[in-house]
UniProtKB/Swiss-Prot annotation:
Natural source organism: Prochlorococcus marinus (strain MIT 9312)
EC number in record: 4.1.1.48
Keyword Amino-acid biosynthesis found: yes
Taxonomic lineage from the root: Bacteria, Bacillati, Cyanobacteriota, Cyanophyceae, Synechococcales
Name the record gives this protein: Indole-3-glycerol phosphate synthase
UniProt KW keywords: Amino-acid biosynthesis, Aromatic amino acid biosynthesis, Decarboxylase, Lyase, Tryptophan biosynthesis
Keyword Cell inner membrane found: no
Length: 295
């Protein structure tokens, strides 16, 4: 686990006054840490509106989640596509001004996407759980709640909002947290896509022996720079292990052209998560065909 949790400001007493004093360790070291620290505040605010107990009650009447793994494995297009709905990002700002989640979801399904990823982080990506709910009403495809999950509360909220799967990021979670949150998802019959960015994180995940969907993020979440070599280098080392353990490797981010897609398919990548490439184009169908029709 590379990302710290927000340290509390120490309390200082002066006679009858107590106040918190900010210190150097209370400053986030990078974008990812800043996002994670803000999640603590966001979750507290969510709980003021809807309690965990109320979320659990709402889940009782929901149908079982859709099978994320199966949809990627049986995809007609190869590699299987997790198409992402994302309005903005910390590095690019607003990516898609003409943002209609319902229309985008319908388009993705018609084009043959296996699953859809929906950004739910509000402050940094201009996403929301309301967008996830809208997309759920617009498509029959399995939905991934794309967020920075650090609490069981977020998993229950994702399920109530229509998610079939969640993302867990190895860089922000300890091994104990990963196992605990995976058990929560398993109990709700939700799929889990666990995300790694380097061999150290991947080794951690493989040792846990709990995940059959592993996302290799080509974007360094500390700097938000992308490099497709991340997937290529890790696949050269771990492709045989993935195959033997029935793990579906998913390459995420930085996939911009048909050549990128073919390079990933040829080394054993079974699924790709693509968002910005579609979101920045006014004609999503045209962008899709540039990627998939030539491989």
């Amino acid at each position: 686990m590379e990302i710290r949790r927000r340290p509390p400001n120490p309390t200082v007493r002066v006679e009858n006054l107590e106040y918190a004093v900010p210190h150097r360790e209370a400053q986030a070291k990078n974008i990812l840490e800043e996002i994670v620290w803000h999640k603590d505040i966001e979750i507290k605010n969510f709980k003021k509106i809807v309690s965990l107990e109320d979320l659990i009650k709402k889940i009782e009447n929901l149908p079982d989640p859709k099978d994320f793994y199966k949809n990627i494995l049986e995809s007609k297009i190869k590699p299987g596509l997790i198409a992402e709905i994302k309005k903005a990002s910390p590095s690019k700002g607003v990516i898609r001004k003409d943002f209609n989640p319902e229309d985008i979801a319908i388009c993705y399904e018609e084009l043959g996407a296996s699953c859809i990823s929906v950004l739910t982080d509000k402050r940094f990506f201009q996403g929301s759980y309301e967008i996830l709910e809208t997309v759920r009403k617009s498509t029959n495809l399995p939905l991934l709640c794309k967020d920075f999950i650090i609490s069981a509360y977020q998993i229950y909220k994702a399920r109530v909002s229509g998610a079939d799967a969640i993302l867990l990021i190895a860089a922000i979670l300890s091994d104990d947290d990963l196992i605990y949150l995976k058990k929560i998802a398993d109990n709700l019959k939700m799929s889990v896509l666990v995300e790694v960015h380097n061999d150290n994180e991947l080794e951690r995940i493989l040792k846990l022996k709990s995940f059959n969907l592993i996302g290799i993020n080509n974007r360094d979440l500390k700097t938000f720079k992308t490099d497709l070599k991340t997937s290529i280098e890790l696949m050269h080392i771990y492709a045989d292990i993935f195959l033997k353990q029935n793990i579906l490797p998913i390459s995420e981010s930085g996939i911009n052209c048909a050549q990128d897609l073919e390079s990933l398919r040829s080394i054993g990548i079974k699924g790709v998560l693509i968002g910005e490439t579609f979101m920045r184009e006014s004609d999503i169908e045209k962008s899709f065909k540039k990627l998939f029709n030539s491989i």
